[in-house]
Amino acid sequence: MSKGQSLQDPYLNILRKERVPVSIFLVNGIKLQGQIESFDQFVILLKNTVSQMVYKHAISTVVPSRTIRIPSPDQPEDDAE
């Protein structure tokens, strides 16, 4: 995993696993809302009434509806609770 992905992937994975509602703001100002269904290196699948594939290069900000605790790199995600 590249250094740039070391925070992004665990953060998105926690949001996905805990089904945290998120607001995603795109670079053009559009606000999308839903839950992260899955993601990869290039896209996020956002589910609300429909599923939307959102390209990461179009995303400005991801705002969770509640505070998220990100485990440290040497701490497994399951131990973070």
From Swiss-Prot:
Gene Ontology terms for molecular function: RNA binding
Keyword tRNA processing set for record: no
CDD domains: Hfq
GO CC list: cytosol
Keywords attached to this entry: RNA-binding, Stress response
Residue ranges of domain Sm in the record: 9-68
KW Transcription (keyword) present: no
Function (record text): RNA chaperone that binds small regulatory RNA (sRNAs) and mRNAs to facilitate mRNA translational regulation in response to envelope stress, environmental stress and changes in metabolite concentrations. Also binds with high specificity to tRNAs.
Subunit and partners: Homohexamer.
Annotated family: Belongs to the Hfq family.
Name used for this protein in its record: RNA-binding protein Hfq
Source organism of the structure: Marinomonas sp. (strain MWYL1)
Lineage: Bacteria, Pseudomonadati, Pseudomonadota, Gammaproteobacteria, Oceanospirillales
Encoding gene per record: hfq
